[in-house]
């Protein structure tokens, strides 16, 4: 690998020339080594027949160096060696280094894809099935209290369970850790009856005290997290006996039971089994079908939990790797490319079979009218929002402003491209823009109230109503008082409406009001997809539109010679 890198560094230094005149001292400077070591490197490259070296006698004399192979070939060899060693990180770094060559990048990505997908081997007459998945979001924690990313929620959904869950059929909520539940007439006293002998990954039995601890962590946190408006409505949680939990709400909230289906409400062992929160987030202990056995900056490894109370998963091992380039564009038929891949490109090969989940992502921009500035003027706000519409090219010249206005646009790194698009459209109409991109954690802070425009997204899945409630509650903090009062009134009604259809109608009223008053502008919406090859069996979705790995399986190997 080192010799490969030295060759690529050398050729890059001379701009891809095929023949150069150079001294050994100059080569030593390029390699960052001694004159003697530079000679060794040159000799090694000659033995590999990568270069031809015609020396000139005398120290300081300029010798002739000819490159016999293109850099693409050496880069490919280097990446292949990294992949064969399962050194995905170095393989990816190599691809990023040579990203300027489209053909090389496509070739290297195609080879890297052979690492992902389904891999089976026979051990002690048993087929061991491993699924390797690439993700484009770096994983930080699986602690239900601290998760921010959808990819983290995806892993968490296979490591933890909640008291209840969604069935995926007609928005129905069904038992999970609790086999039954009751609610009193006031809709504030909820009683959950736990299954017996449910095991955590470390072998301890789940009890009501674990539920009390898990919900208590949410109640006591000072962090502003997704769905905090729900769990802050919990007045107390009581363990009536080892298998019965009673939850008292401060006031009725029909979104409480749906909230208990989310990964935020997952049940963890009490006191986190003595671990600090950071350690627990990277090596969590849950009751789910898979357990985390390893986690680094780039890799998360799950192994099946054979004693899962709802039945053992078919897969034995899942390796999830952070891949910081777009894997969607590489779907060539390499013989063992992706079997399961999130968000496939619409240009993917026709050999891929596709199914669609019901989830989608909506990108939007909101206006902060609480901040003293141009957006507090309804007419100017309308002009600014009109610049973002598809037909903005036809805006009359009078829309061009005659005074200098600078707008601050805030977002998170994942949506920086959308923020830049907005800035470009506005700058075309004479507005100056300053885009600020901060981490999801910082985004929850004062940065939003200091900005004029805020770019974010709504993940539309079976938890959409929970997300909408959170979204509109947040938006109400930076809009005019009279509109805020109306929104808070609608949200109060929604929280007490048991019919999800009626709740959806109220959410639509809020959306239409915000759009009409130019507080909200929807940029676009696109569906999420899952592509799979015919060899995959049991593909189904959880409530967030992710593939449920517990049900995925592959046909058995016909013989040991079929291993990959």
Predicted feature locations:
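Append "and occasionally in soluble cytosolic enzymes with long acidic Gly/Pro-rich linkers
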Residues: 370-430
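A structural "hinge/loop" feature
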Residues: 138-152, 204, 256-263, 531-550
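N-terminal lobe/hinge region of extracytoplasmic solute-binding protein
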Residues: 134-183
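Ligand-site clamp/hinge motif
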Residues: 307-349
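A bilobed periplasmic-binding-protein/Venus flytrap-type ligand-binding module shared by bacterial periplasmic
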Residues: 303-306, 354-383, 387, 491-493
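Detector for C-terminal structural segments
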Residues: 56, 113-117, 386-398, 413-422, ...
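Surface-exposed binding/hinge segments that line
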Residues: 63-64, 228-272, 294
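Aromatic- and charge-enriched surface segment that lines or borders ligand/interaction sites
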Residues: 16-20, 41, 148, 180-224
């Amino acid at each position: 690998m080192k010799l490969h890198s030295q060759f690529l560094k050398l050729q890059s230094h001379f701009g891809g020339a095929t023949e150069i005149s150079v001294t050994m001292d100059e080569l030593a400077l390029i390699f960052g080594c001694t004159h003697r070591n530079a000679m060794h490197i040159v000799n090694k490259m000659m033995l590999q027949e990568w270069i031809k070296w015609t020396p000139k006698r005398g120290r300081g004399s300029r010798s002739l160096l000819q490159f016999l192979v293109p850099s693409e070939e050496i880069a490919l060899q280097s990446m292949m060696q990294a992949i064969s060693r399962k050194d995905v990180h170095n393989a990816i770094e190599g691809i990023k280094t040579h990203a300027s060559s489209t053909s090389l990048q496509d070739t290297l990505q195609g080879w890297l894809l052979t690492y992902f997908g389904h891999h089976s081997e026979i051990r002690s007459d048993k087929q061991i099935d491993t699924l390797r998945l690439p993700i484009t979001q770096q994983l930080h924690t699986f602690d239900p209290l601290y998760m921010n990313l959808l990819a983290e929620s995806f892993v968490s959904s296979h490591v933890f369970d909640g008291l209840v869950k969604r069935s995926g059929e007609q928005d129905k909520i069904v038992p999970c850790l609790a086999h039954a539940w009751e609610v009193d007439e006031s809709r504030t006293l909820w009683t959950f009856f736990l299954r017996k002998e449910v095991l955590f990954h470390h072998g301890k039995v789940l009890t009501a005290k674990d539920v009390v601890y898990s919900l208590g962590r949410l109640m006591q946190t000072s962090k502003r997290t997704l769905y905090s408006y729900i769990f802050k409505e919990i007045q107390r949680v009581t363990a009536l006996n080892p298998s019965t939990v009673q939850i008292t709400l401060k006031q009725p909230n029909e979104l409480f039971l749906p909230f208990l289906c989310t990964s935020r409400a997952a049940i963890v062992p009490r006191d986190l089994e003595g671990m600090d929160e950071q350690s627990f987030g990277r090596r969590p202990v849950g009751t789910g079908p898979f357990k985390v056995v390893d986690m680094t900056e780039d890799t998360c490894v799950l192994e099946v939990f054979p004693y899962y109370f709802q039945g053992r998963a078919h897969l034995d091992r899942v390796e999830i790797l952070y891949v910081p380039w777009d894997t969607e564009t590489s779907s060539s038929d390499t013989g063992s490319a992706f079997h399961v891949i999130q968000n496939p490109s619409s240009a993917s090969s026709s050999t891929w079979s596709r199914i669609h989940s019901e989830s989608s992502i909506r990108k939007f921009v909101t206006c902060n009218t609480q901040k003293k500035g141009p957006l507090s003027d309804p007419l100017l706000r309308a002009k600014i929002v009109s610049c973002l519409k598809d037909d903005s090219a036809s805006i009359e010249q009078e829309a061009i402003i005659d005074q200098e206005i600078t707008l601050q646009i805030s977002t998170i790194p994942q949506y920086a491209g959308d923020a830049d698009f907005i800035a470009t459209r506005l700058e075309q109409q004479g507005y100056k823009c300053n885009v600020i991109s901060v981490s999801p954690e910082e985004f929850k802070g004062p940065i939003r109230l200091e900005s004029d425009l805020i770019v974010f997204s709504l993940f539309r899945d079976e938890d959409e109503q929970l997300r909408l409630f959170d979204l509109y509650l947040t938006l109400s903090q930076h809009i005019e008082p009279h509109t805020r009062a109306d929104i808070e009134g609608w949200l109060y009604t929604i929280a007490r409406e048991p019919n999800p259809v009626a709740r959806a109608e109220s959410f639509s009223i809020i959306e239409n009001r915000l759009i009409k008053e130019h507080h909200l502008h929807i940029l676009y919406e696109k569906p999420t997809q899952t592509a799979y090859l015919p060899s995959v069996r049991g593909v189904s979705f959880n409530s967030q539109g992710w593939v449920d790995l517990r049900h995925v399986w592959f046909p058995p190997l016909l013989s040991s010679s079929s291993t990959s």
